[in-house]
């Protein structure tokens, strides 16, 4: 990351995630993926670029579903996620599991449009 921004890489539980939403400085961006996921690898560079371009009031999280299984399994159960990769965005004040914005899949054109939209909202 060129910005020196630190990236959250794991949540011990879904409760730890909710705790983060409570102190959200502006936006929380969470990408769920896995080392073994081909589509996740396909968009890896684009996601890193997106994270590096996010302003300081955006907390970025790159979460491996195998390392934070409690949160991912809960998101699947609540139908917030149905596969990986998925990127979800929560706005300050939203302390629920339902994200304000999300992008599912590895289509680079669609992801680039999502990134443009999010960066304009983050300003």
Predicted regions and their residues:
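Thiol-based oxidoreductase modules, predominantly thioredoxin-like and allied folds used
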Residues: 8-13, 32, 44-72
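Short pre-active-site segment immediately N-terminal to redox-active cysteine/selenocysteine motifs
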Residues: 33-36, 83
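Eukaryotic short linear interaction motifs
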Residues: 38-39, 68-71, 96, 109-112
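The canonical Cys-X-X-Cys-His
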Residues: 37-40, 87
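N-terminal leader/targeting and pre-domain segments
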Residues: 1-28, 108-123
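Non-catalytic, surface beta->alpha helical segment in thiol-disulfide oxidoreductase systems
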Residues: 82-83, 88-123
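Structural signal for hydrophobic/aromatic residues that build the beta-strand cores
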Residues: 17, 29-30, 47, 51, ...
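Short amphipathic alpha-helix with an adjacent loop that forms part of the alpha/beta core around
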Residues: 19-21, 72-79
């Amino acid at each position: 990351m060129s910005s020196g921004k630190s990236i959250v890489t794991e949540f011990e539980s879904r409760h730890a995630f909710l705790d983060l939403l409570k102190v959200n400085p502006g936006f929380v961006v969470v990408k769920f993926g896995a080392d073994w996921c081909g589509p996740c690898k396909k968009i890896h560079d684009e996601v890193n670029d997106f994270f590096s371009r996010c302003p300081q009031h955006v907390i970025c999280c790159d979460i491996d579903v195998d390392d934070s299984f409690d949160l991912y399994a809960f998101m699947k159960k609540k139908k917030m996620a149905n596969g990986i990769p998925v990127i979800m965005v929560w706005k300050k004040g939203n302390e629920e599991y339902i994200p304000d914005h999300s992008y599912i899949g590895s289509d680079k054109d669609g992801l680039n449009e999502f990134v443009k939209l999010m960066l304009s909202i983050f300003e």
